[in-house]
């Protein structure tokens, strides 16, 4: 299951005492600010959580899986996320023991 923006807004409404409308607007504004910063070519770093960075990928050769035809994959810019150390430690600490 994935956490949605609506669920984040509902949790904020309860935990902070915002109205549902205010919480929804806050969450939307938060993500809009992240998007705008990335659109401007800047990285986003959230202390204790991680960071979003832009990486430029150069053109590379690819292959059409249906026909086997060689096709170039165009150069592009992608968004990457790197979890911060605190988040990594928290996730690792709460990972259930599994045997391989």
UniProtKB/Swiss-Prot annotation:
NCBIfam families from the UniProt entry: himA, PRK00285.1
Alphabetical list of InterPro entries matching this protein: Hist_DNA-bd, Histone-like_DNA-bd_CS, IHF-like_DNA-bd_dom_sf, IHF_alpha
Signal peptide (from-to): none
Family: Belongs to the bacterial histone-like protein family.
Name of the gene encoding the protein in the UniProt record: ihfA
The protein's name in its UniProt record: Integration host factor subunit alpha
Keyword Hydrolase found: no
GO molecular function, one term: structural constituent of chromatin
Keyword Transcription: yes
Oligomeric and partner information: Heterodimer of an alpha and a beta chain.
Example GO biological process: DNA recombination
GO cellular component, one term: cytosol
Domain of life: Bacteria
Function comment: This protein is one of the two subunits of integration host factor, a specific DNA-binding protein that functions in genetic recombination as well as in transcriptional and translational control.
Record keywords, A-Z: DNA recombination, DNA-binding, Transcription, Transcription regulation, Translation regulation
